[in-house]
Amino acid sequence: MKPLAMIAAAAWASVGICGAQQIERTFERTINLAGPASLDLTTDSGGIAVTAGSGGSVRIHGILTSGRRLWRSADVESRIRQIESNPPIEQSGNTIRVGYVHDRHLLQDISMRLEIVVPPESQVRARADSGGIRVEGVRGPVDCKTDSGGIEARHIESEVRAVADSGGIHVRDVKGPVYVRTDSGGIDALEIAGSIDAQTDSGGIRLSQTVAAPIRARADSGGATLTLASAAGYDLRARTDSGRIAVPEMTVSGNLSPRQAEGRVRAGGPLVDVQVSSGNIDIR
């Protein structure tokens, strides 16, 4: 390379490094409520976190971050400031919607992370195209969906529904039914006092109950480990196409083989129905 060309290339690289710094701005709002909140949250990119705080108010903190496209930095900063000055927060009674930016162009090359503190009695609906979702300590119900990213829900007093196209799902300490689906990722649903319906195309499944209730588990590629409620009775149906089955002492009422088991645990009870295509089944 000629000296002049080398100088020009080095100068451009230096400008690129300096100019590619991210722009970050925030918006905040506190909404006072007389009663539980119903939240409807969405973000294209950035993720969502909801935690329980004291009653009577919802505290919203949004973080707007630019991408690293040098040639669009001025335009991106202008759009970030538009969102910052008019944050996407709507209220109708105790229903609060956050993240619904009606002019979709404003979010191009911008991520928006939502961090929200709510009264413990709240229910939550959350949607993310790219980014994880975490909900902790609310009454519920909780309904989460993400196209790319994991989902975590803990200490929920009622139903949890979690769906991820790509990402793991971790649910713990739920006092109600749990419904979980992921195309690619593992599933943990532990300490559940309600029914469980879990399915993954690629990944393992771990389930445990504190109260006997129906369990349905499906995994195309990955094993399943289930811990049943202590001293409770269940009806059991388990099958693996490639793997082995380990079950507690039970009364056989149908097939019993290394890859298929059907019978009653203790005196019988809610149905445990487990099928995996490739992997082991371990029921405790």
Predicted segments with their positions:
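Acidic (Asp/Glu) and glycine-rich low-complexity loops/linkers
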Residues: 18-42, 47-128, 134-146, 152-164, ...
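Beta-strand-rich extracellular passenger or scaffold domains
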Residues: 133, 205-207, 224-227, 283
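Eukaryotic tandem repeat interaction scaffolds
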Residues: 175-222
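Bacterial N-terminal signal peptides
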Residues: 5-16
